[in-house]
């Protein structure tokens, strides 16, 4: 992930060096542009925004999305129909960001980690995606049992990116090592105001330190 962040920073720096494109990677407070919903339980940060991309509408502000990929994945992207077809997860991500920031289009830049090649595409917003994802996120956040896995135990994402221990937990063959309030039946996310979590066993809010520590009254979500 650290390598990916460095690559994203390098791509942003290269865009800034271009005379015609104006890039803003940070908001007026000097922080990443952040989109937050459901009292912070459904949130994410963007790579920034850009202007002067489309010569027909130079003042249009677009979302900037930077990703990196190995050579095989990069070739799949180039040979495919579009960025959104290449990765449905990334597609949903930018659709949510565009709606949250009231933007109509995204400039996508994908960096090839093998040969430094670049793929670019401009993507239009699709109405209704954010509302659909907020509804889905609410259902997951408030769920009292773990959601069903979208991937089988033999899926390459499970085999490649998870340790044996993580695979066992993911496949419900073993409990996690760490007890905390987030995996306890007594806890409940607060979706109003500043958000946070509360304990229904002791009827009080739980700060982050206490969430991580858990307690002897812990009961696993199952």
Which role fits each region the language model picked out?
Residues 1-222:
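Accessory terminal regions of nucleic-acid processing enzymes
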